[in-house]
């Protein structure tokens, strides 16, 4: 296929048009008074969003070179979203500003490579300054609520729910977002370890009203094999029956004679017992059984470790304060495991998370970590219509990611103030030539842009407010929601440090690539000739 090759100013101008087209659509969403964007979907109703990356992902331009520019900035938004989970609009605004200022200087004869070196030096200095400005969130529920509220577009109800969820499950816990059946948005917390396997027979139910099995202080037998013969279980069932405590059997499966005998004994009242299948599959099943063993202070009966069911003693069994089983899930609360063993297992899983490259494996390891270290909270998002539901769910997801980022790296003053304060760190930065110094000045100017855009979206004059905020010190900034100057941190207008840092790093990285582009090669689309009309296709004259 033939190619279209464009060089120099023509190529860069078209790339800039693409950057501007995407950035202008995204940046209307920035700040407390940012507007919504409505996206047409190929199926279903339209999607209404204030999420920068959702807008960016929808944009495809007709001109291939302009489209390349748009795709490069789309990469900024997507990468920021992947790493920090929020800050996509800020990253897009920064990228547009660096490209705009940079291309002006390239057109005026500056060396693009030196401009890029200057930009990179400036970004490094700003990131170090952001780290100095950063404050730890610690266990402060109020700070978590503020971060979540701002990221959910100043929705305090969502902020409150997320802070409750974090309070219950801790920073290692898993918080998932589901669609609610009604219009209420609620949080549901599962204490202890829950896995998605229910009782193997409804005859094990102890509470027939709720159709659940409830055990207090049960013994827990863990095995990685199928149990089909009763003689394997007899040696352990006798001492358990004498102790008067219930028994939960977690194995690959209890079947045949063994299951029938357990059910009969349960119905007669001779034994309080229930059997559930082990969670997961293959190697993951073995790992999860080991997790349960560590949590409950038991031992997995496995031929791999040389232990057999018929040799099982009471000391091999785990214990827990309470176990609840329904037809789909089993929950173990307050296992009897040693704290030191659980901590070393948690550290082992954390190390595996660091090493793994697969997103799926990472997600599964994260779930295991949560079940061991904290718990699981589910946020049920309710709304009156499906369109509102999707929009709200997006905001809750953003808020959740932002909160995790804040817990991880701390917080800085929000509303674009932290970036404005970081400008001073660029004064007197050592450079090798004038063009590198110009690169630093480009970043200085660009750091004001998020604040300028927040103010513009609120209908105010950006330059005046940027100048006044720049004159101030520390956390002094502009609250665009109320139109007042305030201390941003004490007013709860805060951003996660990680989000601000990642937004700037990604914006500078992609902008640098774009500024140093000298040639663009695209495909020339052939015009497909129209299909010739078949004779008599109008059926005219036919009887």
Swiss-Prot record:
Q: Which Pfam families match?
A: Cpn60_TCP1
Q: How does it assemble?
A: Forms a cylinder of 14 subunits composed of two heptameric rings stacked back-to-back. Interacts with the co-chaperonin GroES.
Alphabetical keyword list? ATP-binding, Chaperone, Cytoplasm, Isomerase, Nucleotide-binding
Tell me the organism: Karelsulcia muelleri (strain GWSS) (Sulcia muelleri)
List where in the cell it is found: Cytoplasm
Name the family the entry cites.
Belongs to the chaperonin (HSP60) family.
Which residues of this UniProt protein bind ATP? 29-32, 50, 86-90, 415, 495
Record protein name field: Chaperonin GroEL
Give the catalytic activity: ATP + H2O + a folded polypeptide = ADP + phosphate + an unfolded polypeptide
Where does the UniProt entry say this protein principally localizes? cytoplasm
- GO terms for cellular component: cytoplasm
Q: What are the EC numbers? A: 5.6.1.7
Q: Which GO terms describe its biological process?
A: protein refolding
State the Gene Ontology terms under molecular function: ATP binding; ATP-dependent protein folding chaperone; isomerase activity; unfolded protein binding
């Amino acid at each position: 296929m033939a190619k279209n090759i464009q060089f120099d100013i023509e190529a860069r101008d078209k790339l800039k048009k693409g950057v501007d087209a995407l950035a202008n659509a995204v940046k209307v969403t920035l700040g407390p008074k940012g507007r919504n964007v409505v996206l047409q979907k190929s199926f279903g109703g339209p999607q209404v969003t204030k999420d920068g990356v959702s807008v960016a992902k929808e944009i495809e331009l007709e001109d291939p070179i302009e489209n390349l520019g748009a795709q490069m900035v789309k990469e900024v938004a997507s990468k920021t979203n992947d790493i920090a989970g929020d800050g996509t609009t800020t990253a897009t605004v920064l990228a547009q500003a660096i490209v705009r200022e940079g291309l002006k200087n390239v057109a005026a004869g500056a060396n693009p490579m030196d401009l890029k070196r200057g930009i990179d030096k400036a970004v490094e200095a700003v990131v170090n300054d952001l780290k100095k400005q950063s404050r730890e969130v610690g266990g402060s529920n109020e700070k978590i609520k503020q971060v979540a509220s701002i990221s959910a577009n100043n929705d305090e109800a969502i902020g409150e729910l997320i802070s409750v969820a974090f309070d219950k499950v801790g920073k290692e816990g898993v918080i998932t977002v589901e669609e609610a059946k009604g219009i209420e948005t609620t949080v549901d917390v599962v204490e202890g370890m829950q896995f998605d396997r229910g009782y193997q027979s409804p005859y094990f139910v102890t509470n027939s009203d709720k159709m659940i099995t409830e055990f207090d202080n049960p013994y827990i037998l863990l095995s990685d094999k199928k149990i089909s013969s009763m003689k394997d279980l007899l040696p352990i069932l006798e001492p358990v029956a004498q102790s008067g405590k219930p028994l939960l059997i977690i194995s690959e499966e209890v079947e045949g004679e063994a299951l029938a005998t357990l059910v009969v004994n349960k119905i007669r009242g001779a034994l309080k017992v229930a059997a559930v299948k082990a969670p997961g599959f293959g190697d993951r099943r073995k790992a999860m059984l080991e997790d349960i063993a560590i949590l409950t202070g038991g031992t997995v009966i496995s031929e791999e470790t040389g232990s057999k069911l018929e040799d099982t003693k009471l000391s091999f069994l785990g214990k827990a304060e309470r176990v609840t089983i329904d037809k789909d899930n089993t929950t173990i609360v307050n296992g009897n495991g040693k704290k030191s063993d659980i901590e070393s297992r948690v550290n082992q899983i954390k190390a595996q998370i660091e090493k793994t490259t697969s997103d799926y494996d990472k997600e599964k390891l994260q779930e295991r970590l949560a079940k061991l270290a904290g718990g699981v909270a589910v946020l049920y998002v309710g709304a009156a219509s499906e369109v509102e539901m999707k929009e709200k769910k997006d905001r809750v997801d953003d808020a959740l990611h932002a909160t995790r980022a804040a817990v991880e790296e701390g917080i800085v003053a929000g509303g674009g103030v932290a970036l404005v304060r970081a400008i001073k760190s660029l004064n007197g930065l050592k450079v090798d030539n004038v063009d590198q110094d110009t690169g630093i000045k480009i970043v200085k100017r660009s750091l004001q842009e998020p604040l300028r855009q927040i103010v513009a979206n609120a209908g105010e004059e950006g330059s005046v407010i940027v100048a006044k905020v720049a004159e101030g010190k520390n956390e002094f900034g502009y609250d665009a929601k109320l139109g007042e100057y305030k201390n941003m941190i004490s007013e709860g207008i805060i951003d996660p440090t990680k989000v601000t840092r990642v937004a700037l790093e990604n914006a500078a990285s992609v902008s640098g690539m774009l500024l140093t582009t000298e040639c663009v090669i695209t495909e020339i689309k052939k015009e497909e000739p129209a299909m010739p009309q078949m004779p008599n296709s109008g059926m005219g004259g036919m009887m």
